[in-house]
């Protein structure tokens, strides 16, 4: 995998503020490539960055990450949908293209 691409993805993920999330697709729109490429970078190199702040477009994480991510969301005050436990993407989404 291109080292420059990996660095771009990880730098974008580091910019996501606590209590907010972005999507694989939103990161890909800025870094280039596609959501699956971003997912591959996160799987291989994402340990040192706040990986729980990058989620699927529907506000879910892969089940293997759910418990650890939920603890981070609660600690950071990330908006969750009541009852479902998934992220409230309308309130939690942060766009790396605009910084909002």
Label each residue range with its predicted role:
Residues 1-100:
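Nucleic acid-binding interface residues in structured DNA/RNA-binding domains
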């Amino acid at each position: 995998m291109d080292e420059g691409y990996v660095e771009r993805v990880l730098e974008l993920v580091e910019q996501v503020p606590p209590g907010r999330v972005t999507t694989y697709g939103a990161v890909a729109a800025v870094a280039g490539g596609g959501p699956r490429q971003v997912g591959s970078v996160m799987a291989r190199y994402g340990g040192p960055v706040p990986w729980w702040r990058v989620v699927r477009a529907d506000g879910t994480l892969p089940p293997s990450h759910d418990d650890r991510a939920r603890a981070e969301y609660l600690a950071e005050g990330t908006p969750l949908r009541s009852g479902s436990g998934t992220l409230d993407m309308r309130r939690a989404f942060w766009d790396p293209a605009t910084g909002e």
